[in-house]
Amino acid sequence: DRYERGDVNLDLKGF
């Protein structure tokens, strides 16, 4: 879901 919301950067950073 995060990827669809555009929070991919946060996931990559470990958030």
UniProtKB/Swiss-Prot annotation:
- Primary role: Acts as a primer for viral genomic replication. DNA terminal protein is covalently linked to the 5'-ends of both strands of the genome through a phosphodiester bond between the beta-hydroxyl group of a serine residue and the 5'-phosphate of the terminal deoxyadenylate. This protein is essential for DNA replication and is involved in the priming of DNA elongation.
One Gene Ontology biological process: viral DNA genome replication
Q: Quote the subcellular location field of this record.
A: Virion
Query: Which residues, if any, are the signal sequence?
Result: none
- This protein is called DNA terminal protein
Assembly and oligomerization:
Heterodimer with viral polymerase. Binds to ssDNA.
Q: What is the lineage of its organism?
A: Viruses, Duplodnaviria, Heunggongvirae, Uroviricota, Caudoviricetes
Q: What is its main location?
A: virion
Q: Name one GO cellular component term.
A: virion component
An example Gene Ontology molecular-function term: hydrolase activity
Q: Which family does it belong to?
A: Belongs to the phi29likevirus DNA terminal protein family.
Q: Which keywords does the record carry?
A: Covalent protein-DNA linkage, Degradation of host cell envelope components during virus entry, Degradation of host peptidoglycans during virus entry, DNA replication, Early protein, Hydrolase, Phosphoprotein, Viral DNA replication, Virion, Virus entry into host cell
